[in-house]
Amino acid sequence: MTTSALRRQVKNIVHNYSEAEIKVREATSNDPWGPPSSLMSEIADLTFNTVAFAEVMGMVWRRLNDSGKNWRHVYKALTLLDYLLKTGSERVAHQCRENLYTIQTLKDFQYIDRDGKDQGVNVREKVKQVMALLKDEERLRQERTHALKTKERMALEGMGIGSGQLGFSRRSRGSPSSYTSASSSPRYASDLEQARPQTSGEEELQLQLALAMSREEAEKGGRSWKGDDFPVANGAEPAGQRRRDREPEREERKEEEKLKTSQSSILDLADVFAPAPALPSTHCSADPWDIPGLRPNTEPSGSSWGPSADPWSPVPSGNALSRSQPWDLLPTLSSSEPWGRTPVLPSGPPITDPWAPSSPTPKLPSTGVDPWGASVETSNTSALGGASPFDPFAKPLESTEPMESRDSAQALPKGKSPSPVELDPFGDSSPSCKQNGVKETEALDLGVLGEALTQQPGKEARPCRTPESFLGPSASSLVNLDSLVKAPLAARTRNPFLTGLSAPSPTNPFGAGEQGRPTLNQMRTGSPALGLPPGGPVGVPLGSMTYSASLPLPLSSVPVGATLPASVSVFPQAGAFAPPPASLPQPLLPTSDPVGPLPPQAGTNPFL
């Protein structure tokens, strides 16, 4: 830092100059170089502020009035004024026109230095330029427009350089070359500072300029894309035409794919509901109620839904042999249709209907036996010639058996089954039937038990066993304990639910040891009666009488004056009653009962 710069900073602090004034003093110093453009740009931005504008212009006029020794102050002040007229606020030109006389006096500025060189000529030439600019308004307007465009261009270039420099420094952070490059280019930093907007007006202007440039770039991009529509010079087909030719082909392909998918979905639905073709394989239908052997070999012509039979209708009988198991599935045609209808076949193995009435079937060695089914009675003679379906839930028919069992079966009422398993809980009781010559009892028949309980006169009674029969003649000398122990008499009760149980004893077993309480007659005979002498009852001494507060006083102990007079009304007056005596005699109770104590009741408690 030079001596002049240090002296200038001290003056700024002593005179308490503002920021705008300090910048003007820095731009118009006595240094042998001109004012920096960045500093002049900041001062020009400050002129848009009213307060800063007054400070800037006041310091400029002070610099213009310096003496010849400080000719650099005057020359730099004129240079700054020229810059403010072109890039600053319009009020700068108005104020300069108002103070035009001060500027004109500088045309005669004279100063010759020690070397004899005229330094005033520079000031005079600069004053002429400023005066010509102030007098020609059209030129001033053109100069302002050109200066603003140049400033905006420099600001954009500075922003681009600054952003590139910042991006490069971010990418190369940590490398020593980044620090050297940043430190070795102070011009980039000054341009960046110059490009930054200092006021709101400049910022708005830069924003509008950026929008215009972006709009122009967008238009250029649209023109470059539109250039594909024009044919090229070598006769090749443009890309836009090829793209338009490919669009209908793509649409046709999409339509064909949609049509194929729709047709395939319709065919899938038709396949689901249509019956599957018959294949000569084992029966593997997924339908649990699918009856085998009823699948047509060929589909009826005309439609996929041919005439079919009701799966719940009775199945016609065939000529082939039948099975005794109702749920056996014969190996027949396979089907993938779970709920399809099955037409009736004219020929084939018959299907056993579990719900149809049964008929006599011939006994065949190859017939399967159902362990859970009822016994089947078959005949040795096949008079009918054809086998009929077997019903496991139907009643068995007559069969060839001995004459005795047949007669016993015919003796039963009509509708009753001789089978011991079949029992009608709601029917009348039927006599038991004989099987193989032996009388068979029913499950719920209690007649046998009744016959065993009731003694028939024709039968010999079973002898009852006694101790004599078991011990012999020596049993007569034994003591019979049953005769010694007497059972307590049962109290007669009307409770029907206590029959057969030991009746409760009428006496309290827990009060056997207590003495009986005196009866009312005993208490009456023991208490003194009316009209007895005050000495006490006859035969009872006075010394044996005790006082009891719970018993009333005897009438003989009440004085004669204590009786109520006849003149006392419902509401007695004061003094109607005699005052109570001072001492009342004690009531007398007999200490010993004149009647002897009652004998204790004989308790019948078996636990005492």
Curated annotation (Swiss-Prot):
GO terms for cellular component: cell cortex; clathrin vesicle coat; clathrin-coated pit; clathrin-coated vesicle; cytoplasmic side of plasma membrane; endosome; nucleus; perinuclear region of cytoplasm. Residues 12-144 form the ENTH domain. It comes from the Eukaryota. Residues 287-372 are annotated as: 5 X 3 AA repeats of [DE]-P-W. Residues 346-363, 578-588 have a biased composition (Pro residues). InterPro entries: ENTH, ENTH_VHS, UIM_dom. Residues 174-189 have a biased composition (Low complexity). The modification Phosphoserine is found at S184, S185. A 1,2-diacyl-sn-glycero-3-phospho-(1D-myo-inositol-4,5-bisphosphate) binds at R8, K11, R25, N30, R63, H73. Residues 214-229, 240-260 have a biased composition (Basic and acidic residues). Induction: In keratinocytes, by wounding or contact with collagen. Residues 202-221 form the UIM domain. Pfam families: ENTH. Residues 150-266, 281-475, 498-530, 575-608 are annotated as: Disordered. Residues 495-607 are annotated as: 3 X 3 AA repeats of N-P-F. GO terms for molecular function: clathrin binding; EH domain binding; phospholipid binding. Belongs to the epsin family. This is Epsin-3. It comes from Rattus norvegicus (Rat).
